[in-house]
């Protein structure tokens, strides 16, 4: 221990002395400002649109898209088909909703419907879309107000507040219907307010037709046979489905909804744990005609699969991603699908669900851990 303390003391002295030198040099530079020098923002604005000598992006929104696809290997035991999953956790805010958030805001700006610094954006959300919208609003300079059911995870609320959004929680028993109603009430009472309306905005579907669908087609070399996706706003399954069908009419498209809130299969809305899916009504942009059917997945099965994906595949994902995987495996086990390529999506990163039912046992275990003695 004495030798270790001596080493650390010498190391600290070197670092401190070096830090002092760097501080003096840096301070000298700062004390002599260059007259009329342009700000960083001005320099960025003056950059040419294409910089062939560098791959540096000029803004974070340019990082959206081009996410990887990976095969599942261990949880697929007993499946006759191959399952590949597009990992949307690699988006800037770790969810697929970055795509439509960017698309809808850009579309509204191009149409002259909203203006940074003047317009207040209001939107109902179950979480991930709200985070993505708050992220885009912060980057572009909009005030953002979000309504959401109170059952959404604490992590999602913190993420939204991190980007400066105002949150209004609604009665969980009213589901997304109550959240949407509250958003419309705020829209009517707030000056210069605008709602992007993710459930009816064609730009939501368009971005998946123009980006997500082509990415899947290209990464699979056009070999995708089946695409399966959970239904929230319906933008992803509709946009991707329409694109894949345009390339190959024989590609089969399946939706996914919670068994406890199977509205799209003629059932009634109800409470469930698959956050982001099963909004309790049929969204306007949802294209049901191109789908073979909507697969029902129980919340318990979705949660268990999400846990297995982390333990067996090294993929820490959210509950809706677990539901998508359950549905994909159901299709992969059918004899008629043997040898086919099924593609689905892991829509968000699992760290966003630490306070949810997904990790409640592990959270309690971690909270109860005690330190061990160290000699």
Curated annotation (Swiss-Prot):
Record-linked PANTHER family: CYSTATHIONINE BETA-SYNTHASE
Phylogenetic placement of the source organism: Eukaryota, Viridiplantae, Streptophyta, Embryophyta, Tracheophyta
Residues found modified as N6-(pyridoxal phosphate)lysine: 97
Protein name: L-3-cyanoalanine synthase 2, mitochondrial
Binding locations of pyridoxal 5'-phosphate: 128, 232-236, 320
Known tissue expression: Expressed in leaves, flowers and fruits.
Gene Ontology molecular function terms on file: cysteine synthase activity; L-3-cyanoalanine synthase activity
Induction: Up-regulated by ethylene treatment and wounding.
Catalytic activity field: hydrogen cyanide + L-cysteine = 3-cyano-L-alanine + hydrogen sulfide + H(+)
Intrachain disulfide bonds: none
Keyword Amino-acid biosynthesis in record: yes
């Amino acid at each position: 221990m004495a030798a270790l303390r001596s080493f650390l003391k010498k190391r600290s002295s070197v670092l401190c002395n070096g830090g002092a030198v760097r501080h003096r040099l840096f301070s000298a530079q700062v004390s002599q400002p260059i007259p009329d020098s342009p700000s960083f923002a001005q320099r960025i604005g003056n950059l040419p649109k294409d910089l062939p000598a560098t791959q540096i992006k000029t803004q974070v929104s340019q990082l959206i898209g081009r996410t990887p696809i990976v095969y599942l290997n261990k949880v697929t035991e007993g499946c006759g088909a191959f399952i590949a999953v597009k990992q949307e956790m690699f988006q800037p805010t770790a969810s697929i909703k970055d795509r439509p958030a960017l698309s809808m805001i850009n579309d509204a700006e191009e149409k002259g419907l909203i203006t940074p610094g003047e317009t207040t954006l209001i939107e109902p959300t179950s979480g991930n879309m709200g985070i993505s919208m708050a992220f885009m609003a912060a980057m572009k300079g909009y005030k953002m107000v979000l309504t959401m059911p109170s059952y959404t995870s604490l992590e999602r609320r913190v993420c939204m507040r991190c980007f400066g959004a105002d949150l209004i929680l609604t009665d969980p028993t009213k589901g997304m219907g109550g959240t949407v109603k509250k958003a419309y009430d705020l829209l009517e009472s707030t000056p210069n307010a605008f709602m992007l309306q993710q459930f009816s905005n064609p730009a939501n579907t368009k971005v998946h037709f123009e980006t997500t669908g082509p990415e899947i087609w290209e990464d699979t070399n056009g070999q995708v046979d089946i695409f399966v996706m959970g239904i929230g706003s319906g933008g992803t399954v509709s946009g991707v489905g329409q694109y894949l069908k345009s390339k190959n009419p024989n590609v089969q498209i399946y939706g996914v909804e919670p068994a406890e809130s199977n509205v799209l299969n003629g059932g009634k809305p109800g409470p469930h744990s698959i956050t982001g899916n099963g909004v309790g009504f049929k969204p306007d942009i949802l294209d049901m005609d191109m789908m073979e059917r909507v697969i029902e997945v129980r919340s318990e099965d979705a949660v268990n699969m999400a846990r297995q994906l982390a333990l067996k595949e090294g993929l820490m994902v959210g509950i809706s991603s677990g539901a998508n995987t359950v549905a994909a495996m159901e299709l992969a086990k059918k004899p008629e699908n043997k040898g086919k390529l099924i593609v689905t999506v892991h829509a968000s990163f699992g760290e966003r669900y630490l306070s949810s039912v997904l990790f409640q046992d592990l959270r309690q275990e971690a909270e109860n851990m005690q330190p061990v003695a160290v000699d």
